Amino acid sequence: MKISRKTTLLAGFLLGLILPLAAQVRTTREEYIDRYKSIAIAQMERYGIPASITLAQGILESDCGNSLLSMRSNNHFGIKCKRDWTGEKVYHDDDAKGECFRAYPTVEASYHDHAEFLDKQPRYDSLFAYASDDYKSWARGLKAAGYATAPDYAQRLIRIIEESQLFLLDRPDGEALYARRYGLPRDPEEWFSSQTSV
């Protein structure tokens, strides 16, 4: 089957129009948080993993759901296959070329598996000694346990949490606090001290 030059030019022209539009439809951090905060809170209530940590990892690992890996596989946490994984797989270049990553039918399944992964892997056991509102210890503990290879992984998580005030979600009334966060102190230390003085 021979493809005409006109067809090729038309296809190229259409791709030239569509691709820039698709690139502009990126999920923002705020949209990502609004979309997944309830799931992160539910995982915190079930497993004790701070919602702020879960969301910050999802934001960082998936680029707010915009990364190729997250779009192809719904994997928002960069969890690799390893030997015990029996689910769907996708191959993606990361630290090495063509690494095996877990694939999920939905983003919600990725969030659930992330909590199960941390809960069941012995190397993360020490994290569960931290309170579910101690996001700094959780961030440092994830890095120390080898969750990511980036040397500044803990600092990046903490920065995301503090910039977006995700620490509010770790509180018992977190969703309500987060909804009215614009009137609250941005600095976590200032916010926590204002709560204890009431």
Could you describe each region identified by the protein language model?
Residues 11-20:
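Bacterial N-terminal signal peptides
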